[in-house]
Amino acid sequence: MNKVSVIIPSYNRFEELLNAITSIKKQTYKNIEIILVNDKSSQKEYYNYDWAKENIKIIHLNKNTRSIFGYPCAGYVRNLGIKIADGKYIAFCDDDDIWFPKKIELQLEAMKKTGCKMSSTDGLIGIGIYNSKKSYQKFNAECNLETIKNKFKKIGSKIMNNGFPNILDYKFLKIHNCIICSSVLVEKEILNKINYMKNLRNGLEDYNCWLRCLKFTNNIYLKDLCFYYNGQNYAK
């Protein structure tokens, strides 16, 4: 059973972070390590919490990325986690998102069947901490579907006529980024080939990374709802 290393960048969202970690620990696939990278949060809980007891690797930055780059740089933070990861696979989970229990299991099965070295999924989008009693939109199948269809229509493509394809390649993703970071599972070998994420502004670093990954592998896309995305700052 191959190990999956989960990278969580975090800044001043301790309550949300604990929810994210709990959801990862509830995965049906159990060979998982969690690597938390603290972007010099000011909340004291980050420094008082017993991470070792929870079997979580922790990196505390000496300087916040805002002071290093002039803007929050999740790519830089994630790269620190990737570099110390032991897993064959790397997964990402933002500190205010959560996973549903079969996420990793389903993705690994799909990657094995197709030979793809990268996978993403659909999920739910909402505002604030996930509440299982609330109703949420599907991120791609509902929230983004018409926007993406229109983009493909403008270039004369019929690929989206029947919804999302199972395989997302470079040409497809170049039209529109429909991959949420917290849904991604990718072989570390691919990230090594592209020299990890670039130090771009948040919201740009992940899309840039996916495009570069797709020069070495296709992405198997699952329509299963495998995550909840806190879209507090999301804009179509």
Regions found by a protein language model. Name each.
Residues 63-85, 106:
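Glycine-rich, basic loop-to-helix element that forms the pyrophosphate-binding segment
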Residues 75, 148-236:
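Conserved nucleotide-sugar donor-binding catalytic segment
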Residues 90:
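Short aromatic/hydrophobic "clamp" motif used to bind/position activated sugar donors
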Residues 94-98, 122:
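The conserved acidic donor/metal-binding loop of glycosyltransferases
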Residues 102-152:
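Conserved donor NDP-sugar-binding/catalytic core segment of glycosyltransferases
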